[in-house]
Amino acid sequence: GDITHIDTRARPYGIKVGANGLIYVAFNGDNAIGEVNPETLEIHYFTIPHEDSRIRRLDVGSDGSIWYVNSARGKIGHLNPVTGEVREWDSPSGPNSHPYAIAVIDDIVWYNESGQRPDALVRFDPDSETFQSWAIPSGIGIIRHVWVTQDKALLIHQSSSNRIGRVRLIQGEPPPEDTSGQIGAQNELLAR
């Protein structure tokens, strides 16, 4: 097949395909998210507030909106690609938390803070605008990307540690002795 190159803004990094078929690109060298039409290769840029913003990764919610990590400013953000409205929240560990990887599961946002040791796994509920955090086992190191499994667990890795971790999400009320946030066998983190 043919390969077509298109010029973009600085350092395209994370990329996701939306349910609408459009391609969303995070720019780690600019304060922007791009929306690419795969038929025409036309790019529409959404400007993210603050020139020092750097977007590493993004994911698409069930409503087609974009969730992203603003690594340089220690924030997570939400972009409505229909209206262009952008909103950001401070990550729990502050401006040096360096959010990196992100995934949306059932409209709950999961991401890591790579500026912490050990990394923190963070859960953000957009409806209540509340955060929860868990320390990730130090053997897993800096998480650079996450994947969602068919059973809605998170797979996390850091290439220099030679390990893959699984985060199993527990639904419902905690048992009398809550084990969420504890590390189980084979680098499994239980998160509620």
Model regions and ranges:
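Beta-rich catalytic cores
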Residues: R11, G29, R54, A72, ...
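Blade-level signature of beta-propeller repeat domains, shared across WD40, Kelch, NHL, RCC1
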Residues: P137-R192
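Residue-level detector of Asp-centered blade-edge/turn motifs that repeat once per structural unit
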Residues: V17-N20, V60-D63, V104-D106, V148-D151
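A short loop-to-beta-strand structural motif that recurs across blades of beta-propeller domains
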Residues: N31-E35, K75-H78, D119-V122, R163-R166
